[in-house]
């Protein structure tokens, strides 16, 4: 670039900075240096953290989790909230469905005393509260449960049979236009839970769609499709569900990766079950018939017994997790560990 053009560009950049503040325009190399590695919040599932490619859900971004009823959508977000709190962060839950179970949330490791909860009356109120929490810059993760329950004020105040075509889609589109810049600026993770609906008269392709129009699909950096695969049984007793999450959109890493894990009733995602599956897959645990061994020592017969063994020996579970993370997520410690290291350095 010749000198005159350099001077003209420098003058323009100076004027933009004076008018709109420092950092309004910067060179991509500078932006990368300022931003560094993307900050993430763990999902509470080791397999899903690996499938996401960056070790968790990215902060400063919009994430959508959708799936059929009772597939584990709220469970997954409560685990993410618990992980954010473990790392010293603040979390908020906008409960538009008015269905949050505090006892279950506590069992998953959520600190109820520190969790901010809102049960708004209308969709506009829910999204306005979300925007105000984001703009405060003091909240690390905001969960909206769910998009389908964000009922526009006009619909609530109208009669039962009234037609309100496209109202919810317009509401979501307007809210996301306003929210995205604030989300990026405050480095807040905003998770929208969504439900599935069927499109009528679809001959080819999937008839499934999500509620609230197309805006959320465009604004989301990560979209995850969560499905229940089958029941986990002990005799006739059902202990939980086998669950699969497919990352259908990912702006942070290659998409379309899948994670399979177990959700146990009253306990949430089985961390030990994931360690067993990944340990066998990566050759850290040897499996011969029904027996599992680690470094030549037998640790149990059957997955259920090995799960109990790992619960009783947390040091072995921690060692396995470290080996798996070092192998599959090199250079990415879980957020709670990273936070602990930082506080140790500050001290």
Curated annotation (Swiss-Prot):
Disordered, as annotated region: 326-347
Annotated SMART domains: AAA
InterPro entries the UniProt entry points to: AAA+_ATPase, DNA_recomb/repair_RecA, DNA_recomb/repair_RecA_CS, P-loop_NTPase, RecA-like_C, RecA-like_N, RecA_ATP-bd, RecA_C_sf
SUPFAM superfamilies the UniProt entry points to: P-loop containing nucleoside triphosphate hydrolases, RecA protein, C-terminal domain
Disulfide bonds: none
UniProt-listed GO biological process terms: DNA recombination; DNA repair; SOS response
Biased composition (Polar residues): 336-347
Function as written in the Swiss-Prot or TrEMBL entry: Can catalyze the hydrolysis of ATP in the presence of single-stranded DNA, the ATP-dependent uptake of single-stranded DNA by duplex DNA, and the ATP-dependent hybridization of homologous single-stranded DNAs. It interacts with LexA causing its activation and leading to its autocatalytic cleavage.
Protein name (database record): Protein RecA
